[in-house]
Amino acid sequence: MTDRTREPLAVEGGRPIRDRFLVFGAPDIRREEIEAVVRTLEDGWIGTGPRVAEFEDEFRRYVGTAHAVAVSSCTAGLHLSLIALGVKPGDEVIVPSMTFVATANAVVHVGATPVLVDCERETMNIDPSAVERAITPRTRVIVPVHFAGRPADLTALEAIARPRGIRLLEDAAHGVETIHRGRKAGTMGDCAAFSFYVTKNVITGEGGMVTTGDEEIASWIKVAGLHGMSKDAWKRYSASGSWFYE
């Protein structure tokens, strides 16, 4: 058996380990999905419209939450959720050290400070004891990530956050089908952001969804996601009336 640990790396002229290109994202797209996309193109509703509303309703019912709001990405969902939860410049938001950069970037986007804490070796999820040690008077939100679909310990995090008035925002980018003690991801925090990027197990190419049980949060995110316009896009051309600008 050849000892390949002594060979030079492929970038240095050595023999590549793989003979075929490793595809970054390989979604299972079948005829049903292709036909659904074609129907959407033929209908003319390429952006926010009836099919998006249908998707929101189906996703809400699947997760088991009161509200689901479609957004352009999970990153946008995290960003909007942080604002909806009242995070402002100077505040601190606790995030895990093992996560995609968007988790921390969303915090930076609102002018707050991401505080990275250690993860558990066994689960790769945020360590509740590390979270508790990192809390300061400026802590406003904790953002647990369900890493690789394994649920973060929301029970422990709730016990830490709720008595202190700290909000919980689930980064559920990996969290479709994730369940923690009988509760689905997207129902355990104040709100949650899901990803439908090409590498996820439910995809829309790009795209995301925010779920919440709070009607005020859902309404704000829906309006803010449409640049503050308060009339649903698909109602502009309906019998309910014309589009008005103020």
Where in this protein do the model-derived segments appear?
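Phosphate-binding glycine-rich loop
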Residues: W45-E92, N105-V110, V115-D118, R183
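PLP-dependent aminotransferase-like
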Residues: I83-A172, I179
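Alpha-helix N-cap/helix-start capping motif
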Residues: G49, T75, S97-M98, P151, ...
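Active-site region of PLP-dependent enzymes
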Residues: G175-R181, M188-E246
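N-terminal "arm"/small-domain region of PLP-dependent enzymes with the aminotransferase-like
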Residues: M1-I46, P50
